[in-house]
Amino acid sequence: MQLSVDIRNDFTPSEDLIREIAADFRTGLFVEGVMEPENVEISLSFVTPEEIRTLNRDYRDKDEETDVLSFPADEETPDVYLLGDIVISTDRAEEQAREIGHGLDEEIRYLAIHSLFHLLGYDHMDDESKRVMREREKETLALRKRIDTLTERALEAKTHAYIPYSHFHVGAALETEDGEIFAGANIENASYGVTRCAEQVAMLKMAYEGARRIRILAVTGDADYTYPCGVCRQMLREFADEDTVIVVANDRSDFRLHTLDEILPYSFGPEDLDV
């Protein structure tokens, strides 16, 4: 996901905030089922109260200040899909953050997620459409929280890797449908075939404890976006389903999201044996 940022006021967003917003957008696009989200481009502008009022008047016939505006582009080029522009009044966001009792960054992130779903075609003109849009926002926020937690656990697990041969650290953490978390690191062996990948260690621990269904799996390693090997993908197939989220992370705000079918298409599983 490509995010371009334009600052047209005296607000200076931190690099962490921009990374978090980009991660929120990737999560929202995944929730919406957008294929190839890396090719999507979104423009984010921070503006003054005067500018957002002018935009609101010129494009929505409302001569009043507001907190955020969305301008869908829906333009596709050979290399990128331009989803649209998001414009946030940081002054209004700061006022709302004080009223609600949370930080400015948190308010800006929520406004950005809210606006993302406007770009994706959602609205809140009536109670039902408002409910549907709000559910999408909640789903995105909840998934981001799970990604944060599991990525942190996977990064911590990576430090426990036993890797005298490859010197390549991998950590994994999974959450079951009951909310239990199991973590693992790669454990190598002089007889290379006995080596166990981090994902396998986590899944074996889970299975031993009696859990059988994975809601989300996070994997992190020394390489840029360390993906599960073929054996791990097949083992994951035993305990995952179409709703399982696979997170391939460098850190908690730099990750890719996949479904099982994306990383293991045309797979063989228990149902093929009528189990």
Model-derived features: positions:
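An acidic/histidine-cluster motif and surrounding catalytic segment
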Residues: 1-109, 119-145
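Short, well-ordered amphipathic alpha-helical segments that serve as non-catalytic structural scaffolds
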Residues: 22-26, 153-156, 198-205
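Short loop/turn motifs at secondary-structure junctions and domain boundaries
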Residues: 37, 163-166
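Short, basic/aromatic recognition patches
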Residues: 149-163
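Short beta-strand scaffold segments in enzyme catalytic cores
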Residues: 167-176
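Zn2+-dependent cytidine deaminase-like catalytic core
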Residues: 183-272
